[in-house]
């Protein structure tokens, strides 16, 4: 059976959560006997940050051999940003217009890959397949975020296109009701992300010379909001001189990164708050962590949070944050607090002064992630894909 994973987005060297999920799905489905291909859209050439298994064919829609190379170009990017200033919906339509140029290339990918099923990783990708190409190949559309965040400013044509999906997958049970507000659709399926737990268990209650609060995620203000963590830590840093904050993640949002660095300097935290960038050695990060701090505004099913909890690190998040407020159970595997630096600071301090509490809730965190074991999640996907083929 031929399976095409479609993610029309930058992919070369990009360390996003969606790309991480795609890499894992490619490996899991290949192990289950599928012939897997991947199509992405990137003006750059090179390798993905998260490697694909040997034997998985990777197509770049913008650089298809023997076909016209597509350039999004500075003009298109500028037009998109101008549109965004007036309407997020207009900006997304502008984004789609770039992919719409690539219809011949996408048709060529379908001819070469001959998929029995396509899994679409982003809404504009699904729109191109289901509206632009009107393909009869069954498409499973993945929703990688809170539907309120996805669809509030989504173009109507994008929503109508997604309604042609064979199935739409959501990451949390509560997301089905949210998605139903925007889509006239009744074939939603809940499958969470898999939690890949390395062969290690950490002890967040152990004695160390330096204790660490860790945050992992791209450094960006609208979603991940690392500035709140810095503000929270600044309130208690002098009380806990043997504690540091390590922030791991892509720093492509240069304006926000500059603001974060300024905030660190303003509070005199240069020696204890560090922007570490990206890494492929997460085991070492987890072994050094005592608390996982996650001040996100909204999430779909955060890989970093779930993996930190899976190795036994207690977490702090906001009760208002979608997905986080379902993964973290207050005082069972972490703390859920009202949004804001003050409450976040108090929760951090509760953990920082009590090693046994960290150890106890860390054990709870590890236990709570077991239902998301890879074999359970990928078996669910295998069943769903085969259901699509059976319905043909």
What are these regions (language model features)?
Residues 4, 205-224, 230-233:
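Conserved donor-binding/catalytic core segment of Leloir-type glycosyltransferases
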Residues 16-24, 220-238, 245, 258:
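A conserved mid-protein helix/loop that constitutes part of the nucleotide-sugar donor-binding site
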Residues 149-153, 180, 194-211:
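Acidic anion/phosphate-binding donor-loop and adjacent secondary structure
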């Amino acid at each position: 059976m031929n399976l095409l994973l479609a993610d029309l987005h930058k992919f070369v060297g990009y360390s996003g959560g969606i790309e991480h999920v795609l890499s894992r799905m490619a490996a899991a489905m290949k192990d289950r006997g599928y012939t897997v291909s991947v199509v992405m859209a990137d003006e750059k050439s090179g390798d993905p940050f998260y490697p694909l298994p040997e034997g998985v064919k990777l197509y770049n829609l913008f650089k298809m051999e023997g076909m016209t190379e597509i350039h999004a170009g500075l003009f298109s990017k500028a037009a998109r940003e101008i549109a965004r200033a007036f309407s997020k919906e207009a900006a997304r339509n502008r984004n789609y217009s770039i992919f719409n140029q690539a219809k011949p290339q996408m048709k060529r990918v379908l001819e070469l890959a001959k998929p029995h099923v396509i899994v679409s990783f982003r809404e504009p990708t699904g729109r191109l397949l289901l509206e632009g190409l009107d393909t009869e190949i069954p498409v499973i559309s993945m929703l990688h975020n809170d539907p309120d965040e996805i669809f509030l400013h989504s173009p109507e044509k994008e929503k109508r296109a997604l309604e042609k999906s064979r199935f739409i997958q959501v990451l949390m049970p509560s997301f089905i009701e949210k998605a139903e507000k925007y889509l006239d659709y009744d074939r939603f399926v809940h499958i969470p992300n898999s939690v890949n737990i390395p062969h290690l268990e950490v002890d967040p209650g152990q004695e160390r010379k330096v204790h660490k609060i860790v945050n992992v995620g791209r450094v960006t203000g609208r979603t991940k909001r690392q500035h709140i963590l810095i503000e929270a830590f600044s309130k208690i840093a002098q009380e806990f001189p043997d504690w540091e904050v390590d922030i791991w993640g892509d720093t492509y949002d240069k304006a926000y990164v500059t603001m974060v660095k300024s905030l660190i300097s303003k509070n005199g935290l240069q020696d204890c708050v560090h922007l570490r960038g990206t890494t492929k050695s997460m085991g070492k990060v987890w072994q050094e962590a005592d608390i996982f701090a996650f001040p996100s505004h909204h999430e779909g099913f955060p890989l970093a949070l779930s993996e930190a909890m899976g190795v036994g690190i207690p977490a702090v998040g906001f009760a208002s944050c979608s997905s986080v407020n379902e993964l973290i159970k207050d005082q069972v595997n972490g703390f859920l607090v009202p949004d804001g630096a003050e409450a976040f600071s108090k929760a951090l301090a509760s953990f920082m002064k009590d090693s046994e509490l960290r150890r106890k809730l860390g054990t709870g965190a590890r236990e709570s992630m077991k239902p998301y074991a890879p074999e359970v999640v990928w078996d669910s996907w295998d069943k769903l894909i085969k259901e699509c083929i059976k319905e043909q």
